[in-house]
Amino acid sequence: MSRFFKGGSSDSDAESVDSSEENRLTSSRLKKQDDSSSEEESSEEESASSSESESSEEESESEESEVEVPKKKAVAASEDSESDSESSEEEEETESEEDSEVSDESESESESESESEEESESEEESDESERSGPSSFLKKPEKEEAKPAGLKFLRGESSEESSDEEEGRRVVKSAKDKRYEEFISCMETIKNAMSSNNWIVVSNEFDHLNKVSQKCKEAGRNPPPYIEFLSALDQKLESADKAFIKSLDAANGRAFNALKQRVRKNNRQFQSDIDRYRKDPEGFMKPAELNEIPKPAGKAGQDEVIVDGVATRGIVAPTEGLGKPEEITPADIFKYLRAIFEARGKKSTDRSEQIRLLEKLSTIAVTDYQRLRVKVALLAVRFDINTGSGQYMPIDQWNAALTELHSILDIFDANPKIVIVEQVEDENEEEEEAIAAAENNNGVIQVQGSVVSFLERLDDEFTRSLQMIDPHTPEYIDRLKDETSLYTLLVRSQGYLERIGVVENTARLIMRRLDRVYYKPEQVIRANEEVAWRSFPPTFDLTITPRATTTTPDILIHSLCVYLYNNGVSLLRTRAMLCHIYHEALQNRFYKARDMLLMSHLQDSVHAADIATQILHNRTMVQIGLCAFRNGMVQETQYALQDISTTGRVKELLGQGIQAPKFGQFTPDQDRLDKQLVLPFHMHINLELLECVYLTCSMLMEIPAMAAASSTASDSRKRVISRPFRRMLEYIDRQLFVGPPENTREYIMQASKALADGEWRRCEEFIHAIKIWSLMPDADKIKQMLSEKIREEGLRTYLLAYAAFYDSVSLEFLATTFDLPVQRVTVIVSRLLSKREIHAALDQVHGAIIFERVEINKLESLTVSLSEKTAQLNEANEKLYEQKTQHTNPQENRRRDKGGSVKRRNERTENRNRSDMN
């Protein structure tokens, strides 16, 4: 390995000695020039001045300013050279100064000294207003620490000591010395960074070294140390094995691979010199010495002053134009691509111009590899258009990105040997290198990128546009029509991923496809599938979802979900299960959806999921409740909708809007993040319909329960099923005058009062008058089901409320009164008797109900209530005791828990039997 990557070698010591000797010679030469220029200036001062002492003082002052002013100019020049806002006029002046300095270095130094003299004279003239006389400069200031650093006559009497101190602190260097030190400094920085495996710094410093080397050419010949460095760096990079590359982190790994390609490309133009160096290293290094390196003719640096060991660089980095797009050839494509990627993320980047240039490059590309590289870059730039703006991607750009993704898939179909992968160990910028590397990879040419990432971004931008467009305008409908083309692209991309066999990416794409179909009716799913498959040739088919099975939506959803169950990560499996349950509930398969939800145990872990998954879980629970309602299961509907409908934040829990806080307001960032979680309007569940279903089921359950509680003094029957319904009903009861109902809530409250009074026909009229039922499929069947439920619950309410006033009642009479079959009345009465809700006996011979007189006095009622409260208090105390002692003896705790549970169960049974006997 070369000496550049070995620490503490003798060659580096020799170089440092040469550098110090070179600096000494340079400083002595410049000092002589300063003395000659100072003599000329002193002669001019003697002719213009009348006093010898004044001329000598001015001469010393000019010498001091001549050293200080170039220092300030060098520092300013270094700052201007590093900034990007330098004007064109200053560049022209710098170039003219550099040309004059190359032709005659001593003349440029004398000119700079004359300029510094003029500046010092202007400073003296500006200070004349503060001086009291011609010899006032001989007076010392009151505070020495306030002396200006550039005035020697204010330093005191020991002028020799101050001059010696300044010579130790300041060194005047020429441009070639600066370039030499900068050249060596870059190589040392690269050497140190390589020893610490910091390849990001190596990559950055390598670009800097190339720029400096262009300024250090020896009469058209490259510097020998630079050729030696390139040879050593190339050997270092080529000797790295795959194990070493894998040991690097992601950022350094990418930097290493990029540097390897750039070094390989850069060494092509120096290949002849590198070959000559490797044949005879000593002979190659003899002809040139670094201390004789002249400055380049085109661009030149500026002399600088090194103060306290801190150097400022005045070399302006050369700028390379890329030319006009009309002059681009296919050989220049990769150079343009690299320039475009380097400009990404900068504020001054014109993305529209980049898109125009890439579109031009796509027409110039002649091979599939070139087209693919340009298309990938063009997609990345298109997605950067609205970055940070908070707006959705323009629709024309979205359609263009969709077309380009189809073009990429066309390239894959035409050339199966070209694949796009997310991680490439060694990406080649040139097509010849890519083809050569493919020979070691079974002939497969790999391009870095991700089709799935592009599809996910395209899908996200489509969703964002639907979130921001007003859903009540034709623009929303027009935008929604693009979903068919997006779904077609998802199906086609699935075929490509199945062909290359990337399971993880396939699972991500399957999840996107499932998100587009799980909430839709069967007719819409079938139509989307037909449109998608019609655009493919007959030979196109899929493995996961074959063409023959996609005509049935149930089989399609099942196939997609099963694949995610077997191959997806935990989050994808959870979302797939929720989508599957949602679809089953949408198809009115309540028991299957309920069993899948219970067997998956999602309710135990969904609180730890992300917000989008929690919203999907809430939507699934609501859909299960609506499915139960469509099947006539009132109690199951009420239980499924209870948790969401009683929170008061239904819109937020379902991802259909944001509820403003009562106190304060959202911050802009919080408001933006919350809006991203809102689902598109066509995916919303009608909240008015949801409230109507919940209140109707609450009415059918609460009214009989309230009737049972009013007929007995026992507190056990006074439990509240739906607190929101109770509060609404109590509010209506407090009204002195109640007008005709106007909205859904008022219709249900009026129907509840009629049902409580036993007027089931009037209750049925109010429920049927609600217009929201027309939004449900098979609205007539829903109304018929509600009529039957109202009659049954009216019968239960009648028996529970008026059982105390009857000795017996005929089943035929009840069937006629409530318009129910006798068999149905018998079933309802038997259920009431089995649950001990009424104390009676059923006489099937005569078809009548025989009621028993069971009157509990006040003392017995209070006794039963006290016993129940005592049992509850005892149970609470036992639980508290178990929590305190659960870590002492687990076996004893389990035994005590088991025994205590059995004991409490027996006590409750005994108390219940005793109360029944009374």
UniProtKB/Swiss-Prot annotation:
SUPFAM superfamilies: Winged helix' DNA-binding domain. It comes from the Eukaryota. Residues 907-918 have a biased composition (Basic and acidic residues). The keyword Phosphoprotein applies. Residues 681-856 form the PCI domain. Keywords: Cytoplasm, Initiation factor, Phosphoprotein, Protein biosynthesis. Component of the eukaryotic translation initiation factor 3 (eIF-3) complex. The eIF-3 complex appears to include tif32/eif3a, SPAC25G10.08/eif3b, tif33/eif3c, SPBC4C3.07/eif3f, tif35/eif3g and sum1/eif3i. This set of common subunits may also associate exclusively with either moe1/eif3d and int6/eif3e, or with SPAC821.05/eif3h and SPAC1751.03/eif3m. The eIF-3 complex may also include SPAC3A12.13c/eif3j. This is Eukaryotic translation initiation factor 3 subunit C. The keyword Phosphoprotein applies. Pfam families: eIF-3c_N (PF05470), PCI (PF01399). Component of the eukaryotic translation initiation factor 3 (eIF-3) complex, which is involved in protein synthesis of a specialized repertoire of mRNAs and, together with other initiation factors, stimulates binding of mRNA and methionyl-tRNAi to the 40S ribosome. The eIF-3 complex specifically targets and initiates translation of a subset of mRNAs involved in cell proliferation. Gene3D superfamilies: Winged helix-like DNA-binding domain superfamily/Winged helix DNA-binding domain.
